[in-house]
């Protein structure tokens, strides 16, 4: 009998929604409110519902302030593209503390997964 992995399988719509939310957080962290507005109101079907759905994964008490946050964009992209999201892994990637404060960049690679 195979041991079941502790992961959550999600459909492609959920992955696309989560990618939009991650991009939205990056834009807001960089104070790019104009782009965030277009992402939020023109690309998401129900922005309020989506934010409420994924906010517990991406906000305190699980996350540190955005100034101390670093993204491992290639690994996040790998997880999302495989449609398997281990919640603890995703939370630790998004919320891990950077040793050197750095500005989060939209061109870090995550934007490639938003389409």
From Swiss-Prot:
Native organism: Saccharomyces cerevisiae (strain ATCC 204508 / S288c) (Baker's yeast)
Membrane topology reported for the UniProt record: Single-pass membrane protein
Protein name: Putative uncharacterized protein YJL202C
Domain of life: Eukaryota
Main location as per UniProt: membrane
One GO cellular component, as annotated: membrane
Sorted UniProt keywords: Membrane, Transmembrane, Transmembrane helix
Subcellular location: Membrane
Other remarks in the entry: Partially overlaps PRP21.
Transmembrane segments: 69-90
């Amino acid at each position: 009998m195979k041991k079941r992995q502790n992961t959550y399988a999600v459909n492609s719509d959920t992955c696309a929604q989560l990618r939009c939310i991650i991009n939205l957080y990056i834009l807001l962290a960089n104070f790019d409110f104009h782009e965030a507005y277009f992402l939020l109101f023109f690309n998401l079907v129900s922005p309020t519902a989506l934010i409420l759905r994924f906010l517990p994964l991406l906000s305190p008490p699980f996350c540190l302030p955005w100034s101390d946050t670093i993204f491992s964009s290639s690994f996040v992209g790998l997880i999302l593209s495989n449609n398997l999201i281990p919640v603890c892994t995703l939370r630790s990637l998004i919320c891990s503390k950077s040793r050197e404060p750095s500005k989060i960049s939209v061109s870090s690679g995550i934007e490639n997964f938003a389409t």
